[in-house]
Amino acid sequence: MNYAKYIDHTLLKPESTRNQIDKIIEEAKAFNFKSICINPTHVKYAAEQLKGSDVLVCTVIGFPLGASTTETKIFETKDAINKGASEVDMVINIGALKDGRFEDVQKDIEGVVGAANGKTVKVIIETCLLTDEEKVKASELSKVAGADFVKTSTGFAGGGATPEDVKLMKDTVGDDLEVKASGGVRNLEDFNHMLEAGATRIGASAGVEIVQGLESDSDY
């Protein structure tokens, strides 16, 4: 199995420096990861550095709270794609979901999907803040809104991916969407558990450790 092609090699810490971005770019090229997942401020630079490689640039929208307006998320998405992003991971309006304002949640996702103009959209539902019923509803709304993936976590809300959540999400969306597991996937054992549960993409800062069969102490 080519583990690397399942991995979005991730660096989303607010204090990320250019040197650290250079490091994950070089690691992504060396191991041929599916993408690097970075904050929007680094997208243009990373896209230039990765030109000619198979590694995609993935960035985050409305991150990490999901509480910015739909209009803001739309602008962020268009800007990121114009600067070279091929994939965007957006955070849903979590409060609206908990309020039962499902139409607002769906329209928020649809706004980003439309702005992405055919690029891959992954919808972060922040599982650690949701009940199982809410996880199912968020996954259903992502499907109806036309997203490509539903994703477990930002890694910033105190909890990450679990095999149980991944399975619940996959059972909900079926073959229509893929599932990305992120947050706390630190080693090859974690990685395999997520794939067995139905994930087809893994977001992790421990990408190198995973493909080398080592352990990482990273939370994301």
UniProtKB/Swiss-Prot annotation:
Entry GO terms, CC: cytoplasm
EC number: 4.1.2.4
Main localisation: cytoplasm
Keyword Cytoplasm tagged: yes
Keywords: Cytoplasm, Lyase, Schiff base
Listed Pfam families: DeoC
Pathway this chain belongs to: Carbohydrate degradation; 2-deoxy-D-ribose 1-phosphate degradation; D-glyceraldehyde 3-phosphate and acetaldehyde from 2-deoxy-alpha-D-ribose 1-phosphate: step 2/2
Entry coiled-coil feature ranges: none
Compartments in which it is found: Cytoplasm
Catalytic activity: 2-deoxy-D-ribose 5-phosphate = D-glyceraldehyde 3-phosphate + acetaldehyde
CDD domains found in the cross-reference section: DeoC
InterPro entries reported for this sequence: Aldolase_TIM (IPR013785), DeoC (IPR011343), DeoC/FbaB/LacD_aldolase (IPR002915), DeoC_typeI (IPR028581)
Domain of life of the organism encoding this protein: Bacteria
GO biological process: 2-deoxyribose 1-phosphate catabolic process; carbohydrate catabolic process; deoxyribonucleotide catabolic process
Enzyme class: lyase
Lyase found in the keyword field: yes
One Gene Ontology MF term: deoxyribose-phosphate aldolase activity
Family membership noted in the UniProt record: Belongs to the DeoC/FbaB aldolase family. DeoC type 1 subfamily.
Function: Catalyzes a reversible aldol reaction between acetaldehyde and D-glyceraldehyde 3-phosphate to generate 2-deoxy-D-ribose 5-phosphate.
Protein name: Deoxyribose-phosphate aldolase
Organism: Staphylococcus saprophyticus subsp. saprophyticus (strain ATCC 15305 / DSM 20229 / NCIMB 8711 / NCTC 7292 / S-41)
Lineage, opening ranks: Bacteria, Bacillati, Bacillota, Bacilli, Bacillales
